[in-house]
Amino acid sequence: MNGTEDLGWLDSPTALDDCVDRLKAVKAIGMDAGIDFHGRVHKPMAKQLAKALEPHRPMFIEEPLLSEHINEIKDLSRLVGTPIALGERLHSRWDVRPFLEAGAVDILQPDISHCGGISEIRRIAALAETYDVAIAPHCPLGPIALAANVQVAATAANFVIQEMSLGIHYNDGNQDLTSYTHNPEVWNVEGGYIKLMQGPGLGIEIDEEQVRRLSEGAVPWISPTFMGPGGELREW
């Protein structure tokens, strides 16, 4: 669940109320939620927001600060009991290791498309396990990346939850996670789970003809930018 709209370095405490109210509403219908700060919140407000959310017991808070701020994230993790999640902007075991050594993270979220594929994400998971840290791979992406993550999840003892893009709000037009495969039924969700794929390879069959057709005239995708109130570049 997205955390907040953009906040100033120091903002009115009332600017945090919407995030807290939305979490309360989700919990009221018997569901759990993690809260994604997207690294857009600065330390003065992140401390307040983490404390305000804590009584409502989110599953985790994600990227409460930019990943460059290892010591500040460690301090925040000592301030609240809520698990700290991060890792989509960390691209290797070497990027991950300082957070593990500092005790700054409880749930690592490596992205298989960023960190070098199946081999490296398995090494990251194994390294995290030695620090009693879970993994929840970042993947608001397509079927190939998700299928690869599912195969890793089936072998990682410290895997806890998998992000997926099915029905996500920024899918383009009529395209979704199920659009590019001959066997979209592998993504059927029942009770919050999908079945482990049994097909060859990653377990999905790509509709290559459809991919070629939809890619005609396509332009390179550029990550959107998110600007702060003073014109500063924020994380997306």
Predicted regions mapped to residue ranges:
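Shared catalytic-loop signature of beta/alpha-barrel
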Residues: 57, 68-85, 90-200
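Extended hydrophobic packing segments that form well-structured cores
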Residues: 200-236
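Metal-dependent enolase-superfamily TIM-barrel catalytic cores that perform enediolate-based chemistry
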Residues: 1-79
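Catalytic cores of large soluble enzymes that bind and process phosphate-bearing ligands
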Residues: 11-18, 116, 141, 202
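Structural signal for hydrophobic packing residues in well-ordered secondary-structure cores
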Residues: 27-30, 57, 153-157, 215-218
